[in-house]
Amino acid sequence: MSFRSLIQEMRDEFGSISRHSLRSRSHRGGGGAPRVAAVGPAEAAAMQQSCWAQLPPELLREVLVRIEESEVWWPSRRDVVACAGVCRSWRGITKEIVRVPEASGKLTFPISLKQPGPRDGTLKCFIRRNRTTQTYYLYIGLTEALADDGKFLLAARKCRKPTCTDYLISLDMSDMSKGSNTYIGKLRSNFLGTKFTVYDAHPPYDGAVVSKSRSARVVGLNQVSPRVPAGNYPVSHISYELNVLGARGPRRMNCIMDSIPTSAVQEGGKAPTQTEFPLSGLDSFPSISFFRSKSARIDSATSQLSTQKEEKLVLKNKSPRWHEQLQCWCLNFRGRVTVASVKNFQLVASDENGPTNQEQDKVILQFGKIGKDLFTMDYRYPISAFQSFAICLSSFDTKIACE
């Protein structure tokens, strides 16, 4: 019997026990006379949860560990998420078992999209662009193909304003408004499209300072937890330099990662890691459920002191080489990019960060075109899927002063 069948059988069994217990309490009265007991939905849910919680912790942990190890990738990975939704005890053990992407190389819960990518290897994703609606959708690949059906991760919508352009990023592909409970941040450009700022809707580290931008506002109390300040927390600044060759030449870009210290790419370094969403409305989004405790936590290794005193990590685009026979600028994307485009880039740690030559050669983020309105996005530690997606969105924007 598969683990999935086992879980389903156990769930059905405990569900029938709970229903039988409720019927007995509702129809059994003194002297055999039927009576109606005051059993509400909350009590029924509590009784059913107690049945699940009565499993021996050692047995439960062993079962959940095997499920986590066997269901390594989507769509079967959803079984791990389902286990976290059974009851409180199952949720606690599942969250202990599931490791962050930095160590496991897996995306399980929505918070994984705010956590640094794997140290060993990359997470291979792709972006679909809809020109008509000016929307962008990020997926993680399910196969070795450059693009497949994919597992949806994030969505963004382009919003033009008189002096700037915003890209609103959401966990929900059908609702990309800033007032939505699934809104997690945005990318904002200046009028010329040469400078961009990535804003996180949640504190990226302990002590993060919210931007005093006029656009920063607190949405309805029914959408935002009153314990957590809502606003724009700058996590990255992206700049594109003037291109003397115009549209024919490669772009030059720099990314200052405000929330990541330089030491993150050095031996023994650590990048800030969000562990929970502070918004009460982010309990779930399509195909993935998320569960939070009463407070939002940040990894203790990424305190305000360590982040503010250290220099910020700087990423720069890897310089392409001119191919005389092809008459174009080339980068080695290792087969992940197939169409020449000025949007294509690879980001590495800048030499001003002082990393070793080996670390400096590692491509942290690469983005490139593979078809009409279809692009690959591969990222790794120390940046997250959210940060990577926002940086890639900046490549789509028109750059008046650079080209």
Curated annotation (Swiss-Prot):
This is Tubby-like F-box protein 6. It comes from Oryza sativa subsp. japonica. SUPFAM superfamilies: F-box domain (SSF81383), Tubby C-terminal domain-like (SSF54518). Residues 50-105 form the F-box domain. It comes from the Eukaryota. Ubiquitous. Belongs to the TUB family.
